[in-house]
């Protein structure tokens, strides 16, 4: 009982330890996932901060590049001129900047298209040149290539013929082995049949010999029985004769009695 309790307690401990290990592995996996998500979030934040900084730097650079706004103008009556003109100038500058940016982007796209066309044309010309060079080289080495092709064809034919002959030889050997196995099997069957026939003949001969012995014994017994019967018949006849003599000796006037016994078959 004590051993069973200790075993059950050790098993429960192993089960509990396995559960704790699973919980620990799960908690570690969750911690790894949290760390990965935090690192990804921090990377995203850093990217956003860098983008915002670049945007702010660009805006500040544009502000610095812009010319200083002129001071407020005063008309002849001593009143400040409306800021509408300055706003118009600002809007005009922005439109000019947009146009300049659009023109710059257009030039970049145009340049990219031209570069792509040049690259495609260059690739086409290189391909044509390579094809032409290959054709010229093939034309120069036509005879050599034909000889090499013929050599390889002949070599392939020799290899195929050799493989075919080897395959035919393997098939022939396999057929010979199968035929030999069949002959061995047939020979074994014949030997088994001959053994069975010999065994049957031996059994028949033994049975015939036993039957002949039994017949001889029966004949001998019959002969002995016949001899015993003959002896008994002779003994009976002798006794009958003696009895007749005795009877005749006592009374000679009596007629003779004749007795006869039938021999049993």
From Swiss-Prot:
Motif (LXXLL motif 2): 193-197
Any Pfam family hit: ARGLU
Skewed-composition ranges (Basic and acidic residues): 60-76, 85-105, 180-192, 229-245
Gene Ontology MF: a single term: cadherin binding
Positions of region (Necessary and sufficient for transcriptional regulation): 67-265
Motif (LXXLL motif 1): 164-168
Region (Necessary and sufficient for RNA binding) location: 1-66
InterPro entries with a match to the protein in the record: ARGLU1
Function: Dual function regulator of gene expression; regulator of transcription and modulator of alternative splicing. General coactivator of nuclear receptor-induced gene expression.
Record note on domains: The N-terminal region can bind RNA; preferentially binds 5'-CGG[AG]GG-3' motifs.
Family per similarity comment: Belongs to the ARGLU1 family.
UniProt-recorded name of the protein: Arginine and glutamate-rich protein 1
Organism: Xenopus laevis (African clawed frog)
């Amino acid at each position: 009982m004590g051993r069973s309790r200790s075993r059950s307690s050790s098993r429960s401990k192993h089960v509990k330890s396995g559960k704790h290990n699973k919980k620990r592995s799960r908690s570690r996996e969750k911690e790894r996932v949290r760390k990965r998500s935090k690192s990804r979030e921090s990377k995203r934040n850093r990217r956003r901060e860098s983008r915002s900084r670049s945007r702010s730097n660009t805006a500040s650079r544009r502000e610095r590049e812009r010319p200083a706004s002129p001071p407020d103008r005063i008309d002849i009556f001593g009143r400040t001129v409306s800021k509408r003109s300055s706003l118009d100038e600002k809007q005009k500058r922005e439109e000019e900047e947009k146009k300049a940016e659009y023109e710059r982007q257009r030039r970049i796209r145009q340049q990219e298209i031209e570069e792509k066309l040049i690259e495609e044309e260059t690739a086409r010309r290189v391909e044509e040149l390579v094809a032409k060079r290959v054709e010229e080289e093939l034309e120069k080495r036509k005879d050599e290539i034909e000889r090499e092709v013929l050599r390889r064809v002949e070599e392939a034919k020799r290899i195929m013929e050799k493989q075919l002959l080897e395959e035919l030889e393997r098939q022939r050997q396999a057929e010979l082995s199968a035929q030999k196995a069949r002959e061995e099997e047939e020979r074994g069957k014949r030997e088994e049949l001959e053994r069975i026939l010999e065994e049957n003949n031996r059994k028949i001969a033994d049975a015939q010999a036993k039957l002949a012995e039994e017949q001889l014994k029966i004949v001998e017994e019959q002969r002995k029985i016949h001899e015993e019967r003959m002896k008994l018949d002779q003994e009976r006849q002798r006794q009958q004769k003696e009895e007749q003599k005795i009877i005749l000796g006592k009374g000679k006037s009596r007629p003779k009695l004749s007795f006869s016994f039938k021999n049993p078959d």
